Amino acid sequence: MNHDQAVLNRIWCETLFEELYRFGVRDVCVAPGSRSTPLALEANAHTSLKLHTHFDERGLGFLALGLAKASQRPVAVVVTSGTAVANLLPAVAEAGLTGEKLVLLTADRPIELVGCGANQAIAQQGIFSNHVCASLNLPSPNTQTSLNWLLTSVDQVLHQQAVSGHAVHINCPFPEPLYSNAPKSIYQSYIDTVAVWRAEGGIYSNKQMPLPMPTSIAEIEQRKAVVVIGSVTLQEAKQAHQFAAQMGWPVLCDPQSGTTSDWSGFDIWLQNPAARAQLSQCDLIIQFGRRLVSKRLHQWLEQQVQAGCDYWYVSPDFERDNQSHLPQQHFVCSIAAWLNVVTNREVQPVAWANELPRFSAEVNKQAREIAQSSLCEMMIALHLSSLVGSADLFLGNSLFVRMVDMVGQLHGVETFTNRGASGIDGLFATASGVQRARSNPMLLMIGDTSALYDLNSLALYSHQETPVVIVVTNNDGGAIFDLLPVPPQQKQALYQMPHGYRFEFAAKQFGLDYVRPTSMTELTERIVGHFAHGCGALLVEVNTPPNQASQHIKQLADHVRALV
C-alpha cells in the first residue's frame, strides 16, 4: 500500500464527523481555508449534515452560537490554521457563559511546523483557555494511531460537553499533501478496525448519567414566594407562569423569557419605597434560568437573601450563576422536569403582593405619556409585542434591551439574546444562526454601535428568503453612558463616541431592502407589512436624539419613585 497522507487525513475527518453526528451535531459552520480541506470536504460529504459558510471567522463563530442557541444541539465549527482560530474567541467566550455547545474543529500545521517560522502557524493548543470545558489536541493522522483511540478520545470530550455544556476544542494538525483523488479503500483494513461501530450506528463509548430530580416542595405551599423568570425557552416560561399562578405568587419576567405579567416594569417600580417594601415581604425567591438584565432586580435579590430570604435557582447548567455569592439552592436539572414534578398535585394558593400591579399599571401609563406616540425607543419598546407578532425576537445588547426590561410587555414571544458576556459584537451573525435553526420570521433589534461592529455579517442575510426585519436604533453612539456616572468632560469623546453614520449604503452593499421611517405609524406599517407580504431581509433605521432615551427613563423613574 502506497502512503497517501491526504486520504488518511480524510479518513480521520470522516470518522470524526460521523461520531459528531451521533452525538447530535446537525449543522457545521465552515470558513474558507486550505489547511482545513479534509474537515471541509468530509463535512460536505456527510449527507445528514447541513453546512453554513461565512468568510469571516469571528462572524462564523457567532453564527454557530445562534444555531446552537436555537436548536439546543451542538454545532461544529471548521476553520483553517492561524489567526482564523483566534477569531473564534469572542463567540467561545459567550458560549462559555451561556452554555451553548460549540465543537471547534481547528485545522493546524503539524507539530514540526509550529514555532519555527512556518507560514500561518501559531500556537493553537490551549488558545481558548478556560473558555472551553474540554480540549483535545489530536496527533497528525497516521495508521500507527488506531481509529479506536480517535473515537474514545473524541467521545471523552463530547461526554464532558454533554454534562457541562459550553464549547469544546479539537485541534487537528494535518500534514501535507492535503489534496488527493485516491479512494479511501487503499486503507480498507485500517477503516475496518471500527467496522462494527460503523454498522451499529451508536456512540462508540457511551456513558449513562443519572437524572437529578428536585426535592419535594410540599412544605412551601404557605410561604410568600416570588418567581423570577430569566433566560429560558418560551415553553419553560409558560410552565413557570402556570406554576406561579397555581401557587398564587407574583412573577417577575426578564425580557429574555418572552413573557410578561401583572408585575411588569419592576426595574422602575422597585425604586418606589412602598412597592419595594411590599415585595420585600417575600421569604422565598425561585429563579428559573440565567442572566437577568435588570441590575436593580439583582440588587433587590441580594438584599432579600442577605436578610434571610431563601433563594432557589433552577437551571440545567452546572455552572454557578450567583454574582453576589449568596447562599443558594441550585437544582441542576431540566426546568421542565422540575416543574412537572412540582405541579403534579393540588395546592391551596396563598395570593399576596396584590398592591403591586397598581405600580406596574402606572409605569405603563406614564411611559405612554412620556413617549407621546412619537417615534422613540420608549414607544417602540411599549409596542414591541405587537410589532413582532408571531415572529421570533432577537434583542441586542444596547440601551434598547434595558428599555424593554423597564417598560416592554412581551406576550408569548420566543426571544433570544447574547447576555453572557453581553458584548456588542457578533449580533447580526448570532441572530442569523437563530433564524436558520428555527426557519421562522424574525425581528432583530440592535443598536447603531453594535451594528457597526458586525457589518460583515450582513452578508449572511443577502440570500435570505424568510422575512427578517433588522431594526437599527441609531442614537449616534453609546447613549447608554448617559445612565452611568462617567466623567462628563470625557463622556462624548471616550464613551459615547458619536460617529454620524447612517446605514442606507450598508444595506445596499449587501443587497438588503432599506427604509428610514419618520413616525411610529410608518414604522409599524413597514414591519407588519414586511412580515405579512415581504421576503428576505429589511433593514429599518430609526434615528433618535442621542440623549432622548436616557431622559425618558429618568422622567419615568422620577414619577414612579414619588408615588404613594
UniProtKB/Swiss-Prot annotation:
SUPFAM superfamilies: DHS-like NAD/FAD-binding domain (SSF52467), Thiamin diphosphate-binding fold (THDP-binding) (SSF52518). Binds 1 thiamine pyrophosphate per subunit. It comes from the Bacteria. InterPro entries: DHS-like_NAD/FAD-binding_dom, MenaQ_synth_MenD, MenD_middle, THDP-binding, Thiamin_PyroP_enz_TPP-bd_dom, TPP_enzyme_TPP-bd. It is an enzyme of class 2 (transferase). Its cofactor is Mg(2+); Mn(2+); thiamine diphosphate. GO terms for biological process: menaquinone biosynthetic process. The keyword tRNA processing does not apply. Pfam families: TPP_enzyme_C, TPP_enzyme_M_2, TPP_enzyme_N. One of its GO terms (molecular function) is thiamine pyrophosphate binding. Belongs to the TPP enzyme family. MenD subfamily. PANTHER family: 2-SUCCINYL-5-ENOLPYRUVYL-6-HYDROXY-3-CYCLOHEXENE-1-CARBOXYLATE SYNTHASE, PROTEIN PHYLLO, CHLOROPLASTIC. Catalyzes the thiamine diphosphate-dependent decarboxylation of 2-oxoglutarate and the subsequent addition of the resulting succinic semialdehyde-thiamine pyrophosphate anion to isochorismate to yield 2-succinyl-5-enolpyruvyl-6-hydroxy-3-cyclohexene-1-carboxylate (SEPHCHC). Homodimer. This is 2-succinyl-5-enolpyruvyl-6-hydroxy-3-cyclohexene-1-carboxylate synthase. It comes from Vibrio vulnificus (strain YJ016). The lineage of its organism: Bacteria, Pseudomonadati, Pseudomonadota, Gammaproteobacteria, Vibrionales. The gene is menD.
